[in-house]
A protein has these predicted regions:
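Structured secondary-structure scaffolds
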Residues: 1-170, 189-232, 249-263, 395-398
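Cys/His-rich finger/ribbon microdomains and the adjacent scaffold used
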Residues: 1-55, 62, 179-196, 271, ...
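A generic structural signal for well-ordered coil/turn residues at beta-strand boundaries
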Residues: 14, 38, 86, 91, ...
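Acidic, turn-prone loop/beta-hairpin segments
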Residues: 26, 170-198, 229-321, 325-349, ...
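Short, contiguous acidic/charged loop-to-helix segments that flank catalytic cores in large enzymes
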Residues: 50-51, 59-66, 241-249, 302-310, ...
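Short beta-turn/strand-loop junction motif enriched in small, turn-promoting residues
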Residues: 76-81, 327-328, 404
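Conserved NTP-handling cores and scaffolds of large molecular machines
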Residues: 160, 318, 325-329, 403, ...
Length: 425
């Protein structure tokens, strides 16, 4: 520090002369003495000289070749001058290579221009590519890789888009319902969200962004799009009051937490979501200023998780039978089906704990019946047999479910009683 700040005459003692030529005027040399010494001294020249920074650094990040370079020279100079390391942690990453794992060279024409990727897919795709990669080894990059990743990005974005669309007109300050008004599947979705918080928090803590990416992707695609959002579509479209508000309350809580989780990676997308999201008092204008959601607030006990794992297993078996019925031209869409579930006492008790209309929604069929005893097609769930037939009644033009109540409202002869009441409301 003294060397950088002081003039030559302040460093050299008065009267000092050159032994060779006898000169007494001194000038500081601006040449680099040693590249590793200079770069290894940056903790003193940068961290300690800038008031907005602090010593030691939270992290030094570089490629693996720097263990004998910058990492080492920084450690040596800091230990020698201060007795401690200049960093709290070190993160080492591999190199970016092409799709075949070869080094990129201009002469080979195998480089990837970030501006072209941004033009085609947006800047968040590059950030998602980094997060989805195992950076501890060499990372492959290429147009095909970014194209594939754009599909994953689209699924995450579409999950948020679907939820936002169904929050239209929802005011979280007045419309949120109490926990005891949520359906069981709503509580399952929030429990899945809590698991996401646990996994992403653990990933961020150790810079394992690949773990964060996979947790978010699986949550959006498997837990949300393929299951929860699919099951709740009918409730959102065809009911008013507590049932719809319960689904919206659940979706709102999910979207708020999910957006905060993806913000460090998909910073532009998360802010776009945040801008369209209904707010409660105290929310920041920018999502990056929000605290990460804390796990535990929606956690479910193991018995509840086991119950819903079994219900999902039953649903999967029903889907297999529906596919067979579709192949045999018995039904077209799943809502054309009436399902009979033959159960032993254990399975009957499990399924009977869910209201029949909610159970039909879970299976995405018009009608469901529980029967104690054996029957139907054998399944992978012990004590369960499944049979499918065409649903009775007529098809509602609004919800597409089959019902005997079609035309019960004179003003709406093609609607079921439920949809007629929604239209009249």
């Amino acid at each position: 520090r003294v060397l950088f700040r002081s003039e030559a005459e302040q460093i050299i003692p008065a009267g000092e002369v050159c032994e060779k030529c006898g000169a007494s005027e001194w000038t500081k040399d601006t040449d680099i003495m040693d590249v590793w010494f200079d770069s290894g001294s940056t903790h003193a020249a940068v961290l300690e000289e800038r008031p907005e920074l602090r010593f030691p650094a939270d992290m030094y990040m570089e490629g693996g070749d720097q263990f004998r370079g910058w990492f080492q020279s920084s450690l040596l100079t800091s230990v020698a001058s201060k007795g401690c390391a200049p960093y709290k942690s070190v993160l080492c990453h591999g190199w970016v290579v092409d799709e075949q794992g070869k080094q990129m060279h201009k002469s080979a024409g195998n480089g990837v221009e970030p501006s072209e990727i941004i033009k085609d897919y947006g800047a968040d795709i590059i950030r998602l590519w980094v997060a989805s990669s195992d950076y501890t080894v060499d990372v492959r990059a290429g147009k095909n890789i970014f194209k594939q990743l754009s599909e994953a990005y689209r699924k995450i974005r579409n999950t948020a888009r679907f939820i936002l669309g169904n929050l239209d007109g929802f005011d979280p300050n007045t419309d949120c319902v109490a926990d005891d008004q949520l359906q069981e599947i709503d509580r399952w979705a929030l429990a899945a969200l809590d698991d996401l918080m646990v996994n992403t928090s653990a990933g961020y803590a150790v810079y394992d962004f690949n773990k964060v990416y996979h947790a978010v992707y699986n949550f959006c695609v498997v837990a949300m799009s393929n299951f929860y959002l699919d099951v709740t579509k009918d409730r959102l479209y065809c009911t008013n009051g507590a049932g719809r508000k319960a689904a919206q309350t659940t979706m709102y809580k999910i979207l708020v937490a999910l957006d905060k989780i993806i913000a460090p990676i998909l910073c532009f997308t998360s802010q776009e979501i945040w801008d369209f999201m209904p707010k409660t008092e105290g929310m920041n204008k920018y999502v990056v200023f929000e605290e990460m959601p804390k796990a535990g607030q929606y956690a479910a006990d193991e018995a509840f998780k086991a119950k819903w794992a079994q219900l999902i297993a039953v649903r999967d078996e029903v889907k297999k039978v529906l596919e067979q019925a579709r192949a045999e031209k018995v039904i077209g869409a799943s809502l054309e089906a009436a399902v009979t579930l033959y159960c032993n006492d254990t399975v009957y008790s499990l399924l009977n704990s869910i209201p029949m209309d909610e159970l039909a929604d879970l299976m995405i069929v018009s009608q469901v019946e529980l029967v104690k005893g054996e029957g139907g097609a054998a399944s992978a769930v012990e004590g369960l047999g499944v049979a499918a037939a065409h649903a009775t009644g007529e098809k509602c033009e609004r919800c597409w479910k089959y019902s005997s109540s079609i035309g019960s409202h004179a003003a709406h002869p093609t609607l079921c009683a439920r949809c007629a009441s929604v239209v009249e409301a």
